[in-house]
């Protein structure tokens, strides 16, 4: 049995057509189903529906053989038990700093609100900047508006939400897309099966970008 971990939302919507190229189609609509384990048209393949931030954990610990996760999630994740063989080039966005429009950056310690704590620590350490990191799980845009933080680090798509809240995107930390991740032990035990799937997905990605 091959288990693939996916998260609902944009990544799931963009991944399903790629899996269909490999003949893997869920037997019911994951967006409408309450089931968290969904069979597919291939009897030996099932989908596991989990939170986006949990995909690497399920894959590393062998609860899933493969998964699809945003590069932002993988950058934040600290585990080591994953291969990242393929950029699926879907769910593209940017990981950026943002602050109040026209605000002057303080010269002393910078207060940064984000759910990407590990990314933030690395980013500012590379700059040699002293920062206080405030972990938030949502509504990042509030932090600079009410004086909780000077800046935020978050995923930015169009930037409309930032601008609607009086913020502007600033430094680009990374360009984000979703990646296929594979459990290291699964890659050894089911190498032929998984490699065939990787090859099929790679061809599907390349075909889309030739069009």
Swiss-Prot record:
Q: Which Pfam families match?
A: HisG
**Gene Ontology terms, cellular component aspect?**
cytoplasm
Q: What does this protein do?
A: Catalyzes the condensation of ATP and 5-phosphoribose 1-diphosphate to form N'-(5'-phosphoribosyl)-ATP (PR-ATP). Has a crucial role in the pathway because the rate of histidine biosynthesis seems to be controlled primarily by regulation of HisG enzymatic activity.
Question: Which source organism does the UniProt entry give?
Answer: Pseudomonas syringae pv. tomato (strain ATCC BAA-871 / DC3000)
Per its UniProt record, what CDD domains does this chain match? Answer: PBP2_HisGs
Complex and partners: Heteromultimer composed of HisG and HisZ subunits.
Q: Which reaction does it catalyse?
A: 1-(5-phospho-beta-D-ribosyl)-ATP + diphosphate = 5-phospho-alpha-D-ribose 1-diphosphate + ATP
Write down the EC number.
Answer: 2.4.2.17
A GO MF annotation of the entry reads: ATP binding
Q: What is this protein called?
A: ATP phosphoribosyltransferase
Entries under Gene3D superfamilies matching the protein: Periplasmic binding protein-like II
Q: Which domain of life is it from?
A: Bacteria
UniProt pathway annotation: Amino-acid biosynthesis; L-histidine biosynthesis; L-histidine from 5-phospho-alpha-D-ribose 1-diphosphate: step 1/9
Top-level enzyme category: transferase
Q: Which UniProt keywords apply?
A: Amino-acid biosynthesis, ATP-binding, Cytoplasm, Glycosyltransferase, Histidine biosynthesis, Nucleotide-binding, Transferase
Work out whether the entry's keyword set contains RNA-binding. no
Q: Which SUPFAM superfamilies match?
A: Periplasmic binding protein-like II
What is the phylogenetic placement of the source species in the record? Bacteria, Pseudomonadati, Pseudomonadota, Gammaproteobacteria, Pseudomonadales
UniProt similarity note: Belongs to the ATP phosphoribosyltransferase family. Short subfamily.
Q: Name one GO biological process term.
A: L-histidine biosynthetic process
Subcellular location(s): the record lists: Cytoplasm
